[in-house]
């Protein structure tokens, strides 16, 4: 039962060959030592589970790492397949769709840009015509105003002359009326 020591017979009998008293006391002490050693081994085998637990722990960690490694390998393989499918199928489809759509969008944008440029050009031409018309109209009004202001002294002179003539006629008329009235008042 002991690991590497000598076994003593059960019952603590002395080893054959007899011995002196000193030897018997040593033999008993040696036997007790062996018994204690055997009890320690029995205790460690029955009650000390550290080596077993350490072995089980190592085994569990090894299995976990293997399974984890396999699981990670499966995940990496799935990712690799997904990336391969994306590169082989999805990206070319997307690229072709984008090319078709982008060319249509580019054509539409170009047409819209041309329309906007034409509208802007028409608007600028209309504004220029309107501005030219306003400038011409303003010049015409200024010429008319200048002519009007130039004619004013002549018209004023004419009006003043007509007024003076009308006043003279009225004076003459009132003078005649006074004469006629004076004729009638003498009666």
From Swiss-Prot:
Any single GO BP term: vesicle-mediated transport
Cited Pfam families: Muted
Modification type N-acetylserine: residues: 2
Region of interest called Disordered, as start-end residue ranges on this chain: 1-26
Acetylation in keyword set: yes
Xref: InterPro entries: Bloc1s5
A Gene Ontology term for the protein's cellular component: axon cytoplasm
Superkingdom, natural source: Eukaryota
Keyword Coiled coil recorded: yes
Function statement: Component of the BLOC-1 complex, a complex that is required for normal biogenesis of lysosome-related organelles (LRO), such as platelet dense granules and melanosomes. In concert with the AP-3 complex, the BLOC-1 complex is required to target membrane protein cargos into vesicles assembled at cell bodies for delivery into neurites and nerve terminals. The BLOC-1 complex, in association with SNARE proteins, is also proposed to be involved in neurite extension. Plays a role in intracellular vesicle trafficking.
Disease as annotated in the protein's UniProt record: Hermansky-Pudlak syndrome 11: A form of Hermansky-Pudlak syndrome, a genetically heterogeneous autosomal recessive disorder characterized by oculocutaneous albinism, bleeding due to platelet storage pool deficiency, and lysosomal storage defects. This syndrome results from defects of diverse cytoplasmic organelles including melanosomes, platelet dense granules and lysosomes. Ceroid storage in the lungs is associated with pulmonary fibrosis, a common cause of premature death in individuals with HPS.
Family: Belongs to the BLOC1S5 family.
Name of protein: Biogenesis of lysosome-related organelles complex 1 subunit 5
Organism from which the protein derives: Homo sapiens (Human)
């Amino acid at each position: 039962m002991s690991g590497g020591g000598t076994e003593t017979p059960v019952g603590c009998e002395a080893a054959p060959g007899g011995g002196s008293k000193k030897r018997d006391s040593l033999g008993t002490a040696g036997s007790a030592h062996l018994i204690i050693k055997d009890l320690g081994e029995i205790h460690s085998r029955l009650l000390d589970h550290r080596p077993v637990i350490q072995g089980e722990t190592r085994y569990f960690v090894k299995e976990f790492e293997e399974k984890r490694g396999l699981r990670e390998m499966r995940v990496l393989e799935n990712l690799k397949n997904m990336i391969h499918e994306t590169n082989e199928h999805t990206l070319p489809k997307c690229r072709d769709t984008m090319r078709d759509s982008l060319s249509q969008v580019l054509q539409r944008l170009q047409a819209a840009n041309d329309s906007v440029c034409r509208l802007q050009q028409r608007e600028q031409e209309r504004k220029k015509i309107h501005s030219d018309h306003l400038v011409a109209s303003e010049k015409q009004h200024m010429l008319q105003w200048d002519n009007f202001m130039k004619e004013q002294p002549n018209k004023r002179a004419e009006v003043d002359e007509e007024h003076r003539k009308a006043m003279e006629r009225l004076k003459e008329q009132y003078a005649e009326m006074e004469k006629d009235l004076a004729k009638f008042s003498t009666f």
